[in-house]
Structures are given as C-alpha cells and as structure tokens.
Amino acid sequence: MRLPRPAALSLVAVAVAALTGSVIASAPAQAARVPMQDLTGTTIQPTLFGMHVFNLQNGVFPTIPVGSVRLWDTETTWSSVETAQDQFSWTKLDGAVATANANGVKDILMVLAGTPSWATDDPAAGGLAGVLPGAAGMPKDFADWDDWVRQVVTRYKGRITAYQPWNEANLTTFSTGTPAEMAELTKRAYDIIKSVDPAATVVAPGTGTRLGGPFKKFYPAYLKELGARGWPVDVWAAHTYPASLGTPVERAVLARLWIDTHKAAGAPDKPLWDTENNFGLAGPGPTNPDQDIVGTKAADWAARTYLDAIRLGISRVYWYSWGPELDLVGIQMNTGSPAAVALTTLQDWIVGATYNGCTGAVKVTCTFTKGGKKSTIVWTERGAAPFKTKGFTKICALDGTCKPVTGKKIRVSSPVQLTR
C-alpha cells in the first residue's frame, strides 16, 4: 500500500468509524445453508463482477472484464452535482456514464446520497469524512430530495440502470438520519424512479455489517419502517467488510447475519447484492491494525469473495476498488495485480456457466456447466486438504495456468478448476 486517495470517501469514513466501533463476533466456518436467494440452476451473469473505478468520471477504466460499476467516490454525489439549489454540474456524472458505456458496461448503479450544504439539516454532520460538510445530514426539505432524484433519473433514463438512495446509512459518518427518515427517503426515491424509468432497479442503502452496534441499532428498525411503506426496494444490499484481521470466512458470517436479519423481519425475498467489499481495512479498535494482503492470498481471497457470494445467494459484488494503490484497503486491484489476474481467470471459468451447487464446509466443492461441459472448482476455507482427482484430466489455477492431472490426489487450498 502506497498512495492514499483524497477522493476515497467511503473507506476513510469506515476506517474512522472502525477505530471506535465494536466488531460483530466472528464464527467458525459453517456448512452451507439454504440462502434467502438460491442461485442453483441459474446462469452466472457478467454483472456478478461489479467494480468501483477510481477516476471513472475522468475516463479511467479497468483492464480486466467488468460486468457492472457502482458510482461512488467518482465526484457524483448529490452535493457534487447540485452545487446550489437548481444549479447542476453534470460533467463528472456524464463522464462516468460515458466511460462505462464506451467500455461495454451498460449496467450502472448510482448512489444518490450526499446532501448538499445548502439542503442539509445538519451542516456539522460528518459529511463523508469531512470532505463534503453536511453531506451526512438529512434534507431540511424532502422536496429537495424529490427534485434531485427526478432530475437524475430523467436525464439518465435507460443509461443508469440502478439507483441506491444512500451509502452505509447505519454509520453516522454517512447519515445522521433516523431509520424512519431513511425509509422515507427510500420510498420517495422508489416512487419517483419507477414513475420516470420503470425499468430501473432500486437498491436498498448499502448497510455496513462489521460494526455490531450500528448494524443492530439501525438495520432491523430500518426494515420495520420500510415494511410499513410497502417494501419499496427491488434489491437488498450490504457491505460485508470483515474486521481487518478477518478472512473470507468471517465475511461470510457477516453476510449470513445480514441475510438472517431480513428473515427475522419478515422481509420479502429479493435479490441480494454486496455493493462494496475488500479486506484488511483497519479496525475496529487498536487490536485490528490494517493489513496488506498480497500475492497468492490476495488472489485467493478476491476469487473466494465472488465464489462465496454465489454460495450465499448474493448475485452481485462490487469490489472496492480499481485504481492506484490505496493505503486503506488490504487487497489492491489494478493491472497485473494478483487479485486482478484471479478475477479475470474466475470470470473465464464461470461467466455464462450454469451453477449446479456447492458442497462442503471446510473443503468446498462447487460445480458448473458451461458449453455442455462440467467443471469443478475446489478450495479450502483454511489450511490445505487432499482432493481425489479420479476422472479429471486438467487442473487450472487462478493465475490462468493449466496442466494435466497426474496422480490420484492433489492438495488444494486456493481455488482451482478441474475438468474432465
């Protein structure tokens, strides 16, 4: 990790909150359970592989395949665009959409959050880590919110395909509103979006899961308020960053907790998206220092993030983020990095394939069918374990290399693909 990014508002804010928050307790690996969404039998879509792209608004785009992008830390917040009431600066948002489209990405998720200083009810609110003062406050007049949403959706109808009212609404760095206020913002956005662009998807605010107190205080109450308004979202969303020392196992525990919270609230079954993720972010507290996750481990964890998502019924993950090295996160995603190579390889393995299911708790085996041919991806949650190779003829690694299978067994840890 070398260069901190001034525009990386999201992770700065999470890091600040993490220093004082309490982490949700981790748990040992568990056998797969029936998820809220069962993706067995479905075709893996390119959109599973979502990405945040630093400087997307200025023409930067990843050198690996990307199926969807989330507009956050792209100078496209409400406060960045509507700089004064009814005065809009669309240049950065136009640029972000144009860059994505020019690179073949038509699936764009925009975060509508970030109250402008002229509209906020709390000028002293955390304001996205102090970069945009007042942006964490609620609108003094919800009619200003209504107008903002209508302006965006009207301008980008058919080009921005999904909207998320807020980012990490359970953290005061991003929102000082109550669950009821956030539910009201969600409902108003939903009604406007559907009236202007019925085909657009409305995604629930991406709730942070790793800080137990803010999650438990906010999210069940938000679901209750949302239910009272008729559940006005098309997709549930979370940010399942684990504590800095956490692994993909702990990330999956947080995802299950989030999923189970919907079940406890009687929330309807809707698609699940993880709209922001990485590992190694400092906190909570001094016993969880930031981590650099490099080499094979970075490749392994990046791939497992998406494979675990499929197992959990999560149909989309937006990695944070593509760009120059960012000191706040543990896994770097840029040209030639192990994580970038791994995601390129994994997409080649599974995009367009039918997901047939996974078995195992510690040694995990998932099967896919693509072009009439079956493949098996196997890895371990921890350590290494033997795997019988009878019937398999080729083994491929996340770095894209393949070789013939020799012998009756192999030892696996990182995900590998076996074919017959």
What are the functions of these language-model segments?
Residues 100, 152, 163, 189, ...:
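Conserved, mostly hydrophobic/aromatic
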Residues 360-392, 398-400:
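Carbohydrate-binding surface patches
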Residues 32-75:
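Boundary/entry segment of secreted carbohydrate-active catalytic domains
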Residues 401-420:
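C-terminal beta-strand-rich structural cap/linker in extracellular carbohydrate-active enzymes
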Residues 1-31:
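Secretory targeting and sorting signals
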Residues 64-233, 239-243:
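Substrate-binding cleft and catalytic face of glycoside hydrolase catalytic domains
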Residues 235, 240-265, 270, 280-305, ...:
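Substrate-binding surface in catalytic domains of secreted glycosidases
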Residues 278-348, 357-362:
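Aromatic/acidic polysaccharide-binding cleft in carbohydrate-active enzymes
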